[in-house]
Amino acid sequence: MANKTRWIKSRIKSVNETKKITRAMYLISASKMKRSRDRLDSTRPYFEKINEFMKDLVVHGMQTNHILFEGSYKEGQKRLGVIVISGDKGLCGGYNANVIRSTLNLYENLSNKGEVIFFPIGTVGKNFLSRHGYKVEDNFNYQTQSVSVKVAKGIAQNVVKKYYRGDIHELYIIYTKLISTIKQDVVVKKLLPLDPSEFVSGEFKKDETIRYEPSPTNVLDVVIYEYLKGIIFGAMMDSYVSELAARMTAMDNATKSADEMIQKLVLKLNRERQAVITQEISEIISGAAALK
């Protein structure tokens, strides 16, 4: 019984150490999540204004014959690019599994149309796609946790350049949108070619007071690029915040599970101690009876 008591004490100590780690990870994720949401909120007004410019340019008909609206595919095998935003680490519940599941579903749908090329952002997604033999773009090394407008700019330049060259004819993005701390949804969005109907849905009055210099077409090139950069940055930030929220939930659940396990082990330890005491009392009584 003494050995069993020592084992239970060792187990309680081990679970306590694990609980400290999960609690610390919960607090770190909560702190990072708040800072990341503040960053996302601070950049939102700028990208909302870019979206308004896009609407106005489309209403003016400036998208006509523009390659980013009309498409770059002419003939031969079609190539479809997919930006996949996953996490850099695990211990975040089903976050990465949900992204990978949506990625594989999209691959099944797109593979009938042509060759699918992945542009992974995040270590987990990249490792999975490479390990299972999917075509992954070379020299495309980005981490979710290093998200910034500068990084989003580099990604936008990379994929738009490939689109202009005809290396890809369509572009999609898979990311995770934060609904609440305990709920995150995976979103699949088509980025290129752009769909004019996305910008003219609902009521929108074109602003006749705006003058585009040197010309609306030149302005459109810049605005489209800024729009795509904003979409990619927003998707990366949303995904990163969602990953942190998922990790918070997972670590909170792990901490609660550790508490429950410790309670059960303490109860078990007390029972073992009680059994030892009962046995010792029985031995004393038996010894005393033998002496009579």
Curated annotation (Swiss-Prot):
Disulfide bonds: none annotated. One of its GO terms (molecular function) is proton-transporting ATP synthase activity, rotational mechanism. Its main location: membrane. It is a peripheral membrane protein. One of its GO terms (cellular component) is plasma membrane. Keywords: ATP synthesis, Cell membrane, CF(1), Hydrogen ion transport, Ion transport, Membrane, Transport. Pfam families: ATP-synt (PF00231). It is found in: Cell membrane. SUPFAM superfamilies: ATP synthase (F1-ATPase), gamma subunit. F-type ATPases have 2 components, CF(1) - the catalytic core - and CF(0) - the membrane proton channel. CF(1) has five subunits: alpha(3), beta(3), gamma(1), delta(1), epsilon(1). CF(0) has three main subunits: a, b and c. Belongs to the ATPase gamma chain family. This is ATP synthase gamma chain. It comes from Caldicellulosiruptor saccharolyticus (strain ATCC 43494 / DSM 8903 / Tp8T 6331). The gene is atpG.
